[in-house]
């Protein structure tokens, strides 16, 4: 649509897309008590949003989460204290690690039916950080019951050895965080990635 509009307007300078507000919001209603309490399911939705932004980085140049503290936010704050909601963790990982150039990805995995389409269980984006010499692969396994073992292939180079895995997960998809319990959080693991491929089992959510 943008390309068509630019052609009709005889405009040569590019027009990009900005998401001024995005987040998960489907429970709280009314003028008061609007604070959403997020669960692991919501964190998976946020990670999918972020994957979409990275995959379309050639046209999406800005995306702002709404809000940052309270109401619909990754941080929940009260008079007694504050804590990280589940959606904080994918946002933190993308902000900390997903830098550089967005890479094109090809995903071949099992699918599920939704709205007349077949949707892959693995939602994937990737980026290359030229300064750090690192490839960042972001994967969301949307299967509720099965871990998905996957070969990750590099077509134009080779992996250099140790890989760090940051996994956001919890006891079940309805798990929530609170001031006294972080049921959903990031766990760090190590993996080996040598040659042009490595294999990893992405856990169910």
Predicted segments, located by residue:
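Short conserved micro-motifs at the rims of enzyme active sites and ligand-binding pockets
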Residues: 29-30, 75-76, 149-151, 174-179
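Acidic, Ser/Thr/Pro-rich beta/coil linker or hinge segments at domain junctions
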Residues: 158-198, 202
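Short, glycine-/Ser/Thr-/acidic-enriched flexible segments
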Residues: 24, 67-70, 141-145, 155-159, ...
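Extracellular beta-rich ligand/substrate-recognition surface
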Residues: 113-118, 144-146, 190-191
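Carbohydrate-binding surface patches
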Residues: 119-159, 165, 205
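Aromatic/acidic polysaccharide-binding cleft in carbohydrate-active enzymes
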Residues: 14-126, 131-133
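Short helix-capping segments at alpha-helix termini
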Residues: 5-12, 58, 157-158
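Short, well-ordered amphipathic alpha-helices
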Residues: 1-6, 48-50, 149-153, 165
């Amino acid at each position: 649509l943008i390309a068509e509009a630019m052609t009709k307007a005889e405009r040569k300078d590019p027009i990009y897309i900005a998401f001024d507000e995005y987040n998960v919001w489907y429970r709280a209603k009314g003028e008061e008590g609007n604070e959403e309490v997020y669960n692991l399911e919501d964190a998976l939705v946020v990670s999918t949003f972020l994957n979409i932004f990275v995959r379309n980085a050639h046209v999406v140049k800005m995306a702002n989460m709404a809000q940052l503290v309270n109401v619909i936010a990754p941080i929940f704050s009260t008079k007694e204290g504050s804590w990280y909601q589940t959606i904080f963790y994918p946002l933190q990982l993308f902000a900390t690690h997903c830098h550089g150039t967005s890479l094109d990805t090809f995903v071949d995995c099992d699918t599920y039916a939704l709205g007349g389409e077949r949707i892959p269980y693995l939602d994937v984006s990737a980026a290359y950080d030229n300064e750090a010499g690192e490839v960042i692969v972001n994967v969301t396994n949307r299967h509720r019951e099965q871990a998905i073992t996957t070969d990750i292939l590099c077509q134009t180079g080779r992996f250099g050895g140790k890989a760090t895995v940051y996994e956001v997960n919890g006891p079940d998809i309805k798990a929530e965080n609170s001031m006294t319990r972080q049921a959903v959080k990031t766990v760090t693991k190590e993996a080996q990635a040598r040659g042009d491929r490595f294999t990893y089992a992405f856990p169910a959510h």
